[in-house]
C-alpha cells in the first residue's frame, strides 16, 4: 500500500484496498466456510464458554504477537520506500517488494514441509532479528538481498499465529476469537507505519528497519513471558479426547 501510494496515487490505493475488502467479504459470504469441524459442532451447540475461561494469558500472548508481527511488517514496507527514496531509486521499489513477497512464499512452503512446528515467539524473534540489519543496505540490489531473511520468516510467523489462535479458541467462540486476531493485526498495521515513520524522521531510513525489528522482538518477548506464566490450557481436541476416554 505504501509503495502504491508513493509511486501511483493515494486515491488509487484507497479505492483498490476498498475494492479488495469488498470482494473478500462477498467471497466469504458466498462460500460461507465452516468455522468448526463436524466433530466440534455438538460441543459448540452444547455450550458457549465464558470469556474468562479462554481469554487468558496464553490467548493474550498470541494476540500480542499477532499485533507485533503486523507492526513489524508495516514498518518494513515504509522503511523500504524510505531507503530507496534516499538513494533516488524509488522506481525499483516494486522489484524489492516482489523479492520480499517471493521469499515469503518460499518460506511458507519450506515451513509447511516441516514435521514439527516452531513456537510463535521464536519465529517472531527471528523475524525481528533479521529485519534490523536490513537497514545496512543502501541501494536496491543490496536491499533485495537484505529483505530475503525477513521474507522467508513472514509467512511462517503469520501461519503460526493463526494456528495458535485456532488451537486455543473453543469451537463455540472461534468466530469471536478470529475477530480479535483480525483486530490485533489491523492495529499493528495501523501503528507500524507512523511508528517507523517517526524513527526515520528522527534518524535515517536504517532506523526504520531497526524500529520495526525491535517492535517484533518486544512483542515476541512479551508473548513468551505471558505464555510461561500461564498454565497449559487444554485445546478443544484434547478436551474431546479426555471426554471420550471417560
What would you call each of these model-derived segments?
Residues 173-203:
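A late C-terminal transmembrane helix in Major Facilitator Superfamily
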Residues 52-97:
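Helix-loop boundary and gating motifs at the non-cytosolic
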Residues 120-159:
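C-terminal transmembrane helical hairpin of 12-TM major facilitator-type secondary transporters
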Residues 23-33, 211-246:
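Multi-pass alpha-helical transporter architecture, strongest
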Residues 6, 105-119, 200:
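Helix-to-loop junctions at the C-terminal end of transmembrane segments
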Residues 6-19, 198-217:
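A membrane-interface helix-boundary motif in multi-pass transporters
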Residues 80, 156-169:
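Intracellular juxtamembrane helix-capping segments at the cytosolic ends
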Residues 30-71, 241-244:
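Juxtamembrane intracellular "pre-TM" segments in multi-pass secondary transporters
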Amino acid at each position: 500500500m505504501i509503495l502504491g501510494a508513493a509511486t501511483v496515487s493515494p486515491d488509487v490505493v484507497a479505492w483498490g484496498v476498498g475494492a479488495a475488502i469488498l470482494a473478500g467479504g462477498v467471497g466469504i459470504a458466498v462460500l460461507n466456510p465452516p468455522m468448526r469441524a463436524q466433530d466440534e459442532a455438538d460441543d459448540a451447540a452444547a455450550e458457549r464458554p465464558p470469556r474468562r475461561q479462554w481469554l487468558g494469558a496464553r490467548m493474550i500472548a498470541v494476540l500480542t504477537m499477532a499485533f507485533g508481527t503486523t507492526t513489524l511488517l508495516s514498518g518494513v514496507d515504509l522503511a523500504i520506500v524510505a531507503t530507496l527514496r534516499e538513494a533516488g531509486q524509488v522506481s525499483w521499489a516494486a522489484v524489492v517488494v516482489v523479492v520480499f513477497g517471493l521469499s515469503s512464499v518460499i518460506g511458507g512452503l519450506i515451513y509447511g514441509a516441516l514435521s514439527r512446528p516452531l513456537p510463535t515467539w521464536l519465529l517472531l524473534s527471528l523475524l525481528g532479528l533479521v529485519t534490523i540489519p536490513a537497514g545496512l543496505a543502501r541501494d536496491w540490489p543490496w536491499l533485495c538481498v537484505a529483505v530475503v531473511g525477513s521474507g522467508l520468516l513472514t509467512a511462517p510467523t503469520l501461519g503460526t499465529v493463526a494456528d495458535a489462535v485456532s488451537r486455543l479458541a473453543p469451537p463455540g467462540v472461534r468466530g469471536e476469537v478470529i475477530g480479535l486476531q483480525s483486530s490485533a493485526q489491523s492495529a499493528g498495521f495501523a501503528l507500524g507505519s507512523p511508528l517507523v515513520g517517526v524513527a526515520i524522521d528522527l534518524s535515517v531510513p536504517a532506523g526504520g528497519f531497526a524500529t520495526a525489528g525491535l517492535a517484533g522482538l518486544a512483542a515476541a518477548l512479551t508473548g513468551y513471558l505471558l505464555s510461561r506464566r500461564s498454565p497449559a490450557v487444554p485445546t478443544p481436541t484434547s478436551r474431546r479426547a479426555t471426554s471420550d476416554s471417560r
